[in-house]
Amino acid sequence: MMNNDIQTFLKKAGDSACYVLCLLDVAFSDNRPFDLVYCLQTIVNKGWVRSDFYVLRPDLILQEFTGCKWEVFKAGADYVPARNEYEIDYYERGSIGHFDRPNFHPIVNSRTVKEGRLASKRICRKVV
């Protein structure tokens, strides 16, 4: 069943959910099928993401959809991820920021990625 105001919810996701989409790309990197709208509504309803899609608990988002504990940390642009780590890149162009992954692009041909600079990385790894 869809929530009321789903169109406004999805518009906000389209405008601002690049980090969330990159986290879901990590969570479903094993190519399992998933319901994107369900995932977005779940993480907002649980309070791990604000209604404007600002991410508060990336570790719990990954745990929800993988069943494993995760740690997520901010690293410098020059950080080289280990084999067991997943990379999410953060680009800046003026006052605009955008998250992107090496093999997943929430916005194909993003001006922020093409014309901006790699400012930092978010590194995700399972806790063993």
What are these regions (language model features)?
Residues 1-49:
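Active-site nucleophile-adjacent alpha helix/oxyanion-hole segment immediately C-terminal to the catalytic cysteine
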Residues 28-127:
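Conserved active-site-adjacent core of cysteine acyl-enzyme catalytic domains
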